[in-house]
Amino acid sequence: MRSLWVEKRKDDPVKTQMYYAKQGIITQEMEYVAKIEKLSPELIRSEIARGRLIIPANVNHTTLEPMAIGIAATCKINANIGSSAIASDVQGEVEKMQVSQHYKADTAMDLSTGGDLDEIRKAVIASSKIPIGTVPIYQILHDVGNKIEDLSIEVMLEVLERQAKQGVSYFTIHAGFLLETMPKIAKRKMGIVSRGGSLMAAWMMHYHRENPFYTAYDEILDICARYDVALSLGDSLRPGCLADASDDAQLGELKVLGELTLRAWEKNVQVMIEGPGHVPLNQIERNMKLQRELCHEAPFYILGPLVTDIAAGYDHISSAIGAAVGGWHGASMLCYVTPKEHLGLPNANDVREGIIAYKIAAHAADIARGRKGARDIDDEMSDARYRFDWNRQFELALDSERAREYHDETLPQDVFKEAEFCSMCGPKFCSYKITQSIMDNPEAIEQIAREVKEREALGA
């Protein structure tokens, strides 16, 4: 689909969606997402020009179906996949990618750190119709034999260019963590929990020099502009526990990310901001407001946040609670957490669990925001339940297979797909049936209402 769109623009001096938006041009990608979001193409264009909305769509990922991330759009979710040094398998990551798309993740990040990273990424992008993001520092370190002291700006830029050529649509860049922030880490309970952030800290400690992503930021922007790679400005100092939430280190980095946002916009590079982390429920709204103020309303992309530190094995639930609140208060995309968080590498089933938890959170956020039409599917589900239309209920559920599977555990025969009860209440105790029998006699209800009024009048 995008091949023809990209081909027509191949000779343009700048090829980013932000560049076209600033020129007053509505691209085919903007028209496409406008239809999906049920918004006007002009609103999409103006939001991109303003920096409040992005369409991550590398010019080389021509099979990609454009999508929008921003406060004007529906709340999106990202699924993280990727190999590790302990477990790496190209086919396994492709399977996770397929699961991510089947359960309707909006984007995916390949966070591979083990195996042939280029081959894994190539296979993931080839199998994907959604934007793919990466954290380039993982491959940069991999390519220098995991020796942080051998990391150079030249290697860093070469890896970024290579990934951009492959079709990566957004990079997480840890450019906001500066030398001046290092002393603030000492006050923390858990220090640095971001892998990229910890690697940058190790590099700065080794060389006693400024963060190379910050030093080479202009060169990074040039690469992004050539391929229309959006920047996801990473939160190296996100809190990894409730005790560290909203501290000076986190907010100091956020301020720098705001400055980097303006520099990216000057070069027509699209930007979103990454956020925490582990945050108590009562601090989430404040975190969303601070991001908007410090980062000029660029889309906020949050990991959770997890609202408790003791949910090991259930962190997809703990974090989805925080994600729903964050989405309600303005986050544009939610990065999923799986049940394996803090415990191990997720498998395909963990990916499914994480996606569904976060689809629930994002949908709840859209309803809370009062987004037009967000609740329509919920109302349709309510109608199907009240009519005992089981097959329609399965179709409307975020995880249709799971809904059908649970119903079939106790009532597997097809005849029960027409039954006016489930195994919870049975035919005699179903509140729907009891209510329907009452509602079928409106005259009796009116008679009761008259009697109540008469009693009240006599009592007065």
Curated annotation (Swiss-Prot):
Pathway: Cofactor biosynthesis; thiamine diphosphate biosynthesis. GO terms for molecular function: 4 iron, 4 sulfur cluster binding; carbon-carbon lyase activity; zinc ion binding. Substrate binds at N80, M109, Y138, H174, S194, R195, G196, D235, S236, L237, R238, E274, Y301. Zn(2+) binds at H278, H342. GO terms for biological process: thiamine biosynthetic process; thiamine diphosphate biosynthetic process. GO terms for cellular component: cytosol. NCBIfam families: PRK09284.1, PRK13352.1, thiC. It catalyses: 5-amino-1-(5-phospho-beta-D-ribosyl)imidazole + S-adenosyl-L-methionine = 4-amino-2-methyl-5-(phosphooxymethyl)pyrimidine + CO + 5'-deoxyadenosine + formate + L-methionine + 3 H(+). Its cofactor is [4Fe-4S] cluster. [4Fe-4S] cluster binds at C422, C425, C430. Its EC number is 4.1.99.17. PANTHER family: PHOSPHOMETHYLPYRIMIDINE SYNTHASE, CHLOROPLASTIC, THIAMINE BIOSYNTHESIS PROTEIN THIC. It comes from the Bacteria. Catalyzes the synthesis of the hydroxymethylpyrimidine phosphate (HMP-P) moiety of thiamine from aminoimidazole ribotide (AIR) in a radical S-adenosyl-L-methionine (SAM)-dependent reaction. Pfam families: ThiC_Rad_SAM. Binds 1 [4Fe-4S] cluster per subunit. The cluster is coordinated with 3 cysteines and an exchangeable S-adenosyl-L-methionine. Keywords: 4Fe-4S, Iron, Iron-sulfur, Lyase, Metal-binding, S-adenosyl-L-methionine, Thiamine biosynthesis, Zinc. Homodimer. HAMAP family: ThiC. This is Phosphomethylpyrimidine synthase. InterPro entries: ThiC, ThiC/Bza_core_dom, ThiC/BzaA/B. Belongs to the ThiC family.
